[in-house]
Amino acid sequence: MLDLSSNRLPNRASLITNRAFSAIERFLHIEAMSGVVLLLAAATALILANSQYTSLYEAFWHTPLGFNFGHFNLSWDLHFWVNDVLMTIFFLVAGMEIRREIHEGALASVKQAILPIVAAIGGVCIPAIIYLSFNFNGGHIYGWAVPTATDIAFALGILALLGKAIPSNLHIILLSLAIIDDIMAVLIIAFFYSTNLDPSGLAIAAAGIALVFFFQWISFASAWLYVLPGAIIWWGLMVTGIHPSLAGVILGMMTPVFPTRNLVSPLTTLSNAIQTLQEKNTNTDLHHISTTLKKMRKGQRDIVAPVIRIQKELHPWVAYGVMPIFAFANAGVSFANFDLASQKSFLIVLGIIIGLCIGKPLGILAASYLAVKSGLCRLPPHVTWTGILLIGFLAGIGFTMSIFVSMLAFQDIAQLNSAKIGVLCGSGLSALAGLGYGLIYIKNNKKTHNKP
């Protein structure tokens, strides 16, 4: 916060650095707390789906919603609005987080990025192999990517429950791994779950991307103006046959990582505004004070890079709004329609549970170990192999992202329900394993530190 009683202003580098660190802390806090809201939303959906209100619950999400404009009619059911439209905002925030991490975070240098990248690759490959080993001969092979995803909110939420005894470097590794996991999930969705591609849609998406570049070239600062090119990209991807929510990733990755260029420096604007407020003759001029405060807010806004500022504004809405709504819309699985005696259903559930609970920690630990022993990277300070294993257990909490992938992988309702049950059980077991192992990890660390 700026001190109005002094004419000295912090330098630009200091301000930007403080903003970056506070953004990371805010991100971790919001993700951790939102896990509770997600859990409540999922539990409510499960209760409704297995109660006397199950038909009402299902009918609600199939309610059409749209609008007419002359001869133009746009109408989709609520399920589509949540999964294809609302989730675009989630992917927008994910795209901005990826962009920021590449610019100044854990992915900013090859040396820093090797460990989480290798760990994430192991955490994707081993669960996929485990799932395929159970389901290779069936018609449900397309579910291989379901156990590869990580729900960052739940994972960080469990880590937050373990308290400050967990080294901060473990938080950073988990966050970096989850971000890389998001990148791989986006690539998997784009390349493996996009069918009947129509090239004409790519031209529409390209026009939207070109419009973004044009807006940035003429220095449009308002984020609302980018809704139009974002909608064009979204529509283009849908026409192409690629999941339209990935438009959020494209827009997020294009968000500037440097403050908006102005003719007048933001620091100069703030300095002039502070000087104006300190003048005695303006203390009674409310209009003048109001105008000056607006200039200060503009200077404060412009000093922060759009990728940090917009993410900060959207992140709480995504964490406490978009994701709980998604969980409430998709976690409601009716156990009455689930037949565990069916071999197909059983193998889908088994492949996903083992993939999440065993495949994730095994893949992350094994890949990290090989990378360190081969000399590709080193473990960060205060991070041990037991800590990496803890990260592996928490990364097995797939939940919302795994459910999202399962809805793309399975068209058959029975198979989709089986996949969702596998995700819920696997994520729950991974959460319990992570929490239990985390308590053991903390206890052992205390014993080590107490030794003379």
Swiss-Prot record:
Taxonomic placement: Bacteria, Pseudomonadati, Pseudomonadota, Alphaproteobacteria, Hyphomicrobiales
Organism from which the protein derives: Bartonella bacilliformis (strain ATCC 35685 / KC583 / Herrer 020/F12,63)
Function: Na(+)/H(+) antiporter that extrudes sodium in exchange for external protons.
GO biological process terms, semicolon-separated: regulation of pH
Locations listed in the record: Cell inner membrane
Name of the protein in its database record: Na(+)/H(+) antiporter NhaA
InterPro entries, per the entry: Na/H_antiporter_dom_sf, NhaA
Ranges in coiled-coil conformation: none
Alphabetically ordered keywords of this record: Antiport, Cell inner membrane, Cell membrane, Ion transport, Membrane, Sodium, Sodium transport, Transmembrane, Transmembrane helix, Transport
Reaction catalysis annotation: Na(+)(in) + 2 H(+)(out) = Na(+)(out) + 2 H(+)(in)
Family affiliation: Belongs to the NhaA Na(+)/H(+) (TC 2.A.33) antiporter family.
Ranges that cross the membrane: 27-47, 78-98, 114-134, 141-161, 172-192, 201-221, 222-242, 316-336, 346-366, 388-408, 421-441
Example of a GO MF term: sodium:proton antiporter activity
Top-rank taxon: Bacteria
HAMAP family: NhaA
One annotated Gene Ontology cellular component of this protein: plasma membrane
Membrane topology summary: Multi-pass membrane protein
